[in-house]
Amino acid sequence: MMPEIGNGLLCLALGIALLLSVYPLWGVARGDARMMASSRLFAWLLFMSVAGAFLVLVNAFVVNDFTVTYVASNSNTQLPVWYRVAATWGAHEGSLLLWVLLMSGWTFAVAIFSQRIPLDIVARVLAIMGMVSVGFLLFILFTSNPFSRTLPNFPIEGRDLNPLLQDPGLIFHPPLLYMGYVGFSVAFAFAIASLLSGRLDSTYARFTRPWTLAAWIFLTLGIVLGSAWAYYELGWGGWWFWDPVENASFMPWLVGTALMHSLAVTEQRASFKAWTLLLAISAFSLCLLGTFLVRSGVLVSVHAFASDPARGMFILAFMVLVIGGSLLLFAARGHKVRSRVNNALWSRESLLLANNVLLVAAMLVVLLGTLLPLVHKQLGLGSISIGEPFFNTMFTWLMVPFALLLGVGPLVRWGRDRPRKIRNLLIIAFISTLVLSLLLPWLFESKVVAMTVLGLAMACWIAVLAIAEAALRISRGTKTTFSYWGMVAAHLGLAVTIVGIAFSQNYSVERDVRMKSGDSVDIHEYRFTFRDVKEVTGPNWRGGVATIGVTRDGKPETVLYAEKRYYNTAGSMMTEAAIDGGITRDLYAALGEELENGAWAVRLYYKPFVRWIWAGGLMMALGGLLCLFDPRYRKRVSPQKTAPEAV
């Protein structure tokens, strides 16, 4: 009975989403405040109905209701209860329901926290978000219903959750990523509302920017957590592989970063209006593209869900409708919000525009490298591979001017400035950057690699100028805001991430060795000694754990416990890496296959500064969070009268 209730709640949600999509817009056209205000009620009802359906599915997993096909395919009585809850979004149908839940949650949040926003704007924004919800609810109900039954015959035991997903990181990674994806729908809705109304001013930017910041924070955390999970769970010691689905989350992050900065210019200087709208449309469009790549079956990835052609065609049609319709609307009405401001070449807004262009260019490089092999294969032209060298080379050389401008930008005033005002500071920063980028590799690794120097030069340039500018502000007694300190934290976070990338990419050491009890291998300054392998048993798996002692200069450093697990129901063998993490290095061991005569294949790594990559990502997210606390986002703006015909 419960699955039928869940299905009924989804049908109810579809009806409410349809009302939300139409009724408030009708109210805008008629100038009827009550009809416009109904959008908030519909948003609440939509969230409650979808949340109810989601809880029904969670309950089906907790009680092991294997009459539900989705539960039988992704759970097992031996699965710990917390993984049973996480299995709710562990495969295609449930993850789509999570998407719709979060979509309705964002819609409800806009309804709650929009009391200071003119009612006509709220009505348009919530209606557009309702339209997006309609598309995904139709997709779930007609192609991907998580409440489908296996009656009258159903298994007494489930197939189990994919062992790769039986990890704490994967409990939080998809919700965070989806919160970011879905969050950009708010910026998208504000952009479409601006095009419909024909106006975009600083107040619109002030409404949109906190929602964009929140989405960007969640997406940043999702990417950071996913990268860390890949590092410790997959057993290959990497943190980014330029996988198509990794790229699918990275592209909206790049455009979202550009959008945040563009909104700042629109808010401060009433510039970049059309550009800001285009970025908002592009960010959410790229989120839809990522959904298509994961669920269409056009690629093979550890992230991709198996899917049938009907699902792929539905998503493709929906994506074309949303993106195509948005771009057509932009082409037709974008001129109504075009800026009339001429910016000086040496001004903060011009430098921000240059970096916006570089971010979009980086996104296009990733988009080309991701889609070209897929398009080439679909056209019957054979298989081609675009791998890490292409992405690393193209991306690096786009980021060099980006880092240069990023360091200088906060030092330059809005409107017009003179370069000579900061000339001495730039000279000092240049000398400091040169010295640090040459000295640090030699101090930590006793050798200098050109690409490391380049990466450290970018990081030091950003960090030195950010710290120097903050010190100058403090010494002069200049008033600073949460937004300012958020910017400093985010820029320093990027510098920290670049340091981690520069060291880990160029100084990591990897060894694939055959080891048995008593064997030792030297890597960098460390000696790894293989002691033994013991049998272990978990709630739904059994395996072996290898004990590997590590010494440095003859003194004990740490002990690593690398596991090889066999999951009973799934019949899968998984590697659980052993990692000893530190501020400046990671020691990493992954147990491979058992060989003859008691020997094992073992993969050992020395990874310098790798944790700085994720620490920098967390600092960037913290910077975004600080910006959210800026008081100006809580100021009330007087409503503007809406023309009835401007829907």
Curated annotation (Swiss-Prot):
The keyword Cell inner membrane applies. GO terms for molecular function: heme binding; heme transmembrane transporter activity; oxidoreductase activity, acting on diphenols and related substances as donors. Pfam families: CcmF_C, Cytochrom_C_asm. Residues 30-41, 115-120, 197-210, 257-273, 333-350, 411-424, 469-481, 630-647 are cytoplasmic. It is a multi-pass membrane protein. Keywords: Cell inner membrane, Cell membrane, Cytochrome c-type biogenesis, Membrane, Transmembrane, Transmembrane helix. Residues 1-8, 63-93, 142-175, 232-235, 295-311, 372-389, 446-447, 503-608 are periplasmic. The keyword Transmembrane helix applies. Signal peptide: none annotated. One of its GO terms (cellular component) is plasma membrane. One of its GO terms (biological process) is cytochrome complex assembly. InterPro entries: CcmF_C, Cyt_c_assembly, Cyt_c_biogenesis, Cyt_c_biogenesis_CcmF. Disulfide bonds: none annotated. The chain crosses the membrane at residues 9-29, 42-62, 94-114, 121-141, 176-196, 211-231, 236-256, 274-294, 312-332, 351-371, 390-410, 425-445, 448-468, 482-502, 609-629. It is found in: Cell inner membrane. Belongs to the CcmF/CycK/Ccl1/NrfE/CcsA family. Required for the biogenesis of c-type cytochromes. Possible subunit of a heme lyase. This is Cytochrome c-type biogenesis protein CcmF.
